[in-house]
Amino acid sequence: MKLKGIIFDLDSTLVDSHVDFPKMKRNIIELLESNGHPIGTLSPTDQTTVVIMEHAEQMWEKQGKPEEERRRLRDAITIHMNQGELEAVETLKEIPGVAVAIEKLKARGLKLAILTRGHHEYAVEALKKTGMHSYFDVILGRGETPQPKPYREAIDYTVRQMGLTVDDVVMVGDHQIDYDSAKNSRCRFIGVDTGRRGLKSWENETPPPVLLDSVADLPPYLEAHSS
C-alpha cells in the first residue's frame, strides 16, 4: 500500500472521549422544537447531529423561516455542540499506544490530517493533551469543510489541504460514517475496533474489509502491506 498521507477520525479512533452526545442532541432538539420544529420527529439516539440538522434545514425551508432566524438557530446549535465537546476535554485520554503509533507514522514522512465533525478548538485541545498535536499537518473540524463526513466533499477538501490526491491517502476511523465518507470519495479505508459501540458502529454490524484492533497496530500493518 503506497501512501503519502493518512486522514484520521478523532473520537474513538485516536482518543477516548466521553462527550455526552445524547445530551447534546437533546439540547439541540429542544431548541429546534421550541422554535417551531414538529415535536417528536427528531431523535437523540437514532439520528446523528448531521441528520438532525438536515431535517431542521428542510423544515425551515418548508416553513419559509427567514434566513436571519435560521442563522440565529444555527449559531445557538453550534454553541451547544462546542460546549459539550470542550467539557469532555478534561477527562479525555489517548487510546493506548496511539501516540507512539502516530509518531512512527510521521517519522516515515507521511502527511497526517484530522477530519472530525467536532469543533476545531476541541480537536486541537484533545491532540495537545495527548501529545499528538505537533504531528498533524492539517486539522479540520466542524464547518471547515464544504460538507461534513460522510459527504465526499469532506475528504476531497482535506486531501487538497494536504497537497495530495485521494489516491495518495487512506482514511482511518472507527465508525460507519468514516467508512461511508471514504467510499463516497473512492478513498481507501482502514477501520479500527475502538468504537464504543463495537460491531454496532458498522452498518448491519458488518465491519470494513480491513479492521485493526487499534491505530496502535497501524504502523506494522502498513509495513507489512507496503509495496
Can you say where each PLM-predicted feature lies in the sequence?
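Conserved phosphate-coupling serine/threonine residues in phosphotransfer and NTP-handling enzymes
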Residues: T13, T116-G118
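Residue-level marker of regulatory loop/turn positions in helix-turn-helix DNA-binding domains and
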Residues: E94, L115, Q147
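Polytopic alpha-helical membrane proteins, predominantly small-molecule transporters/carriers
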Residues: V89-E90, I114-T116, M171, H175
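Residue-level recognition of oxygen-bearing side chains
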Residues: V19-D20, G97, I177, D217
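Asp-based, Mg2+/Mn2+-dependent phosphohydrolase catalytic module
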Residues: M1-I6, E103-K106, H120, V124-S227
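N-terminal helical cap/lid subdomain that shapes the substrate entry/recognition surface
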Residues: M1-P96, E103-K104, R108
